[in-house]
Amino acid sequence: MQSEISLGRRVKKFLPVTIAAVTIGCAGMDTGEMLKTTVQGIAGTGPYSNQNVVATYYVTKQHVHIATRKLGKGMVAAVTALGIKNDVDVPQFITDAKVANGSDALTAKAQKENTEIMNFSKKASKAIAKKLDKPFTLSAAAKKELAAAMRLVRMGQILNSRAASGGILMAQRIATRDPMQDLKQAASANPAVFAVSMINNILEAPTDIKNFTDNFKKVTAGFDKIKETESTKDVEVAKKEALEKEVDKETETAISKDMKSMRG
C-alpha cells in the first residue's frame, strides 16, 4: 500500500514533465503504445525496473543508440527503394555496422556516429519528401525494400518512445536519489563504471534525451508520410505486436547484462 501511495505522489509530481516528454518523444506511436511506455517509465517496470540512477542512464542511452541505428538503416533502405540514394551522402558505417548494438552506447565513437546518422536522416527525409511530391512507380523489389525501411524506422520509433520514458524517469530519480551514491554502488559491482565525470552526464541526461526525441520526431514525422502516398499504399509492413516483440528480443541481450552488473 505504501509503495502505491509513493508511486501516486511521484506520478502527480512529474505529470507535466511526463506529458511533455512523451508528446515530444513518441512520433508515430499510437495512444496505447504511448500509455504503455509512459506507465512503464513512471512505475519503473520493464527495462527500467532497476532503481539505480546509473543503470537507468545506461539503459536509456542504449535505447537512444539502437533507435538511431534503426533509423539510419531504415533511411538507407528507403532512399535505395525510391531510387534517390545518389542524392544523399550515406555514411559508410551505417551499412557496415550491426544495427542493434547497445554495448558501445556510451563511447565517443558511437555518439559521433549517431550524430552523423541523424544529420544524414534529416537530409534523406527531405529527399524522400521531394520524391513524394510527384507520382512514381515501384518495382516489386523496390516495394520489398521500402517495406523493410518502414519496418526499421517503426522499430526506431518504438525505441525512441522508450528512451523518452527513460528521460522522464531520469529526472525523477535525480530529484529523489543521490546520483553519486548510486554511482559508487554501481562501481562496487563494476569498477569500470565509476567515473566522477559521469555525474555531469547523468544530471544533463533528461535535457539531452528530450532534445534527441524531439529531433527524432521531426525526422520520422516526414518519413511517415510515405504511408500516405498512393504509390506506396500496397507496401506490406510487419504488425505492431510483432515489432514490439522483436524490439524486446534485440535489446534484451544488450541491456540485461549491464543492468545486472550495475545493480546496487
Residue spans of the language-model regions?
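Extended amphipathic alpha-helical interaction segments
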Residues: 110-264
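Immediate post-signal-peptide N-terminus of mature secreted/exported proteins
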Residues: 28-104, 261-264
